[in-house]
């Protein structure tokens, strides 16, 4: 059925409903249940709901263009089906007295009239629209609402479902125990007013005390189990989010500032887990309490309970609207907070630079500026919260006054006893409080949704370049080929860094890559490590594209050391063995440290290789960090070693030691080495030199060949050798 055909379907449903009410359903159920008119009313109503519900599902299934508001037909048919049975039951059970059974049967006859039929739709449409609107907490398919987020967060507790079930049982038992005080207070009131002595008074008082104490003990046990379980969820969510971030492609970290990522992994995740562990605890507790109170209220006075429930929509509407405002403000606050965190992170991570430029006050002012930008958002957030709390307080007060007035009228008529009214008022006060707490929790839970959406963005995000390769050959030669490679960084897609780059790196050879700054030398190193994918051409290793290799295998065969390597805030031993799937022996660690020139200064520390290097290795000099990073690469015994100005901070003795290792060690005679450098002494000794200019190879050959050619390489050598003014 096309989208424009929905009016025909709606008219058909109206015709079916009219026929059901006129001759069909009343006639059938008058034969099946002739002696019980109230049961007949319920049978007609439920059958009407079921038949129309199937029709609505059919309309929604074949109508494509108007599904948004047509979804409200489902609560509409429910309202139509339940309205008449609900009215009949209310009139029968209310304090105004039971109807005659004939009156119940007369309701069916009245509802089959045309004017009543139209009136039922007029009355049901607003109720259905409200139902459909409030039902947005559980968002339709394709949209993640707060309920979906909550269910997904609880999905992290799949292995702890038994504990959650136990918590729910303890919660229900504890809530039932809390009903003892209002219940026995009502009974005592009746005894006093009737001037009777109750032989079982003491026994009832003891029973009330026992139930109250048991309720407290059960609540304590439930809270303890709940908090332990939520702590498990907290740890798991943090771990899963951080793991998801680590598996993103390298370009992801260029597009997203480190401060923003850190804020999501730490602060946003903590906000969500805090909401689940604290707010959900309160929500479940007051929900269970409210349901128990509602049951006792119905037992005390069905009429007063209906009056109380009819006032609840007024309490729900405004908080629902404020919750949406609160959620949007929460997202904006989190984004603004991430920006201020990024400013602080940049300043703290570059303190030597900040101090060398005497810009401490400038950074502080910039941070204050970011915080000032958050103030309007915080004010709006606070105003929405205060308005919501004030509205609930006034509504609750009006409800209490109304219940006292109506309850007094029922006592005067003899419909309820004074004790029952006292118990009901106590139940109703606690029930209203439970509703108020639930509504006050709702905006804060909406606030956590703003943060959880960001978290699930990371958990659901598929890397643009997934590490899905599977090649892991037993023997690798280390032959590297760049075939017409082009590349632009993801954060600057219109700036071509490499253009038509073609060259070969041979096993057993040291190839030097030289060229001016910005020519793409470090980009070549990044592509060889499979940190990025070329936008054009291929990067082959032993004839296979790098992306085809298993991620862990590739990085045991390819190792790189940069000019400013980062170390982790761990021991020398852990930094050198970083990333290895096996645990190296101390002899292996010492051997590579000696080859890189790191052993001597490491041995000078009191704790030797167990000494912590500080955050990012900031307790070491640049040369010491390079030596440790070089040892970290050498211990892998890679088939391809990439040195990107990796020895520039080493002293002359250690530089010579590294050169002897690369050129004279039998172990390195068959390995491939790419030496990215601006030092002529290192380039001269290389077996082959590639001169890179504007993202492509300008010329290549040995040092002597390039000097004789008199091209770009020779010009650079002469410029570096020329005395400065």
From Swiss-Prot:
<keyword id="KW-0653">Protein transport</keyword>
<feature type="topological domain" description="Cytoplasmic">
    <location>
        <begin position="1"/>
        <end position="8"/>
    </location>
</feature>
<feature type="topological domain" description="Lumenal">
    <location>
        <begin position="417"/>
        <end position="420"/>
    </location>
</feature>
<feature type="topological domain" description="Cytoplasmic">
    <location>
        <begin position="226"/>
        <end position="275"/>
    </location>
</feature>
<dbReference type="GO" id="GO:1904680">
    <property type="term" value="F:peptide transmembrane transporter activity"/>
</dbReference>
<feature type="site" description="Inter-subunit salt bridge with TAPBP">
    <location>
        <position position="17"/>
    </location>
</feature>
<dbReference type="GO" id="GO:0002250">
    <property type="term" value="P:adaptive immune response"/>
</dbReference>
<dbReference type="GO" id="GO:0005789">
    <property type="term" value="C:endoplasmic reticulum membrane"/>
</dbReference>
<feature type="topological domain" description="Lumenal">
    <location>
        <begin position="185"/>
        <end position="204"/>
    </location>
</feature>
<dbReference type="GO" id="GO:0042605">
    <property type="term" value="F:peptide antigen binding"/>
</dbReference>
<feature type="transmembrane region" description="Helical; Name=10">
    <location>
        <begin position="421"/>
        <end position="441"/>
    </location>
</feature>
<dbReference type="InterPro" id="IPR027417">
    <property type="entry name" value="P-loop_NTPase"/>
</dbReference>
<feature type="domain" description="ABC transmembrane type-1">
    <location>
        <begin position="164"/>
        <end position="447"/>
    </location>
</feature>
<dbReference type="GO" id="GO:0042825">
    <property type="term" value="C:TAP complex"/>
</dbReference>
<dbReference type="GO" id="GO:0023029">
    <property type="term" value="F:MHC class Ib protein binding"/>
</dbReference>
<dbReference type="GO" id="GO:0042803">
    <property type="term" value="F:protein homodimerization activity"/>
</dbReference>
<keyword id="KW-0472">Membrane</keyword>
<dbReference type="GO" id="GO:0055085">
    <property type="term" value="P:transmembrane transport"/>
</dbReference>
<feature type="topological domain" description="Lumenal">
    <location>
        <begin position="89"/>
        <end position="110"/>
    </location>
</feature>
<feature type="binding site">
    <location>
        <begin position="515"/>
        <end position="523"/>
    </location>
    <ligand>
        <name>ATP</name>
    </ligand>
</feature>
<keyword id="KW-0391">Immunity</keyword>
<feature type="domain" description="ABC transporter">
    <location>
        <begin position="480"/>
        <end position="719"/>
    </location>
</feature>
<feature type="transmembrane region" description="Helical; Name=3">
    <location>
        <begin position="68"/>
        <end position="88"/>
    </location>
</feature>
<keyword id="KW-1278">Translocase</keyword>
<feature type="topological domain" description="Lumenal">
    <location>
        <begin position="297"/>
        <end position="305"/>
    </location>
</feature>
<keyword id="KW-0256">Endoplasmic reticulum</keyword>
<feature type="topological domain" description="Cytoplasmic">
    <location>
        <begin position="61"/>
        <end position="67"/>
    </location>
</feature>
<dbReference type="GO" id="GO:0016020">
    <property type="term" value="C:membrane"/>
</dbReference>
<dbReference type="GO" id="GO:0015833">
    <property type="term" value="P:peptide transport"/>
</dbReference>
<dbReference type="GO" id="GO:0006952">
    <property type="term" value="P:defense response"/>
</dbReference>
<dbReference type="InterPro" id="IPR003439">
    <property type="entry name" value="ABC_transporter-like_ATP-bd"/>
</dbReference>
<dbReference type="GO" id="GO:0015433">
    <property type="term" value="F:ABC-type peptide antigen transporter activity"/>
</dbReference>
<dbReference type="InterPro" id="IPR011527">
    <property type="entry name" value="ABC1_TM_dom"/>
</dbReference>
<keyword id="KW-0571">Peptide transport</keyword>
<dbReference type="GO" id="GO:0042270">
    <property type="term" value="P:protection from natural killer cell mediated cytotoxicity"/>
</dbReference>
<comment type="function">
    <text>ABC transporter associated with antigen processing. In complex with TAP2 mediates unidirectional translocation of peptide antigens from cytosol to endoplasmic reticulum (ER) for loading onto MHC class I (MHCI) molecules. Uses the chemical energy of ATP to export peptides against the concentration gradient. During the transport cycle alternates between 'inward-facing' state with peptide binding site facing the cytosol to 'outward-facing' state with peptide binding site facing the ER lumen.</text>
</comment>
<dbReference type="GO" id="GO:0019885">
    <property type="term" value="P:antigen processing and presentation of endogenous peptide antigen via MHC class I"/>
</dbReference>
<feature type="transmembrane region" description="Helical; Name=7">
    <location>
        <begin position="276"/>
        <end position="296"/>
    </location>
</feature>
<keyword id="KW-0460">Magnesium</keyword>
<feature type="region of interest" description="Part of the peptide-binding site">
    <location>
        <begin position="430"/>
        <end position="464"/>
    </location>
</feature>
<feature type="topological domain" description="Cytoplasmic">
    <location>
        <begin position="132"/>
        <end position="163"/>
    </location>
</feature>
<dbReference type="GO" id="GO:0046980">
    <property type="term" value="F:tapasin binding"/>
</dbReference>
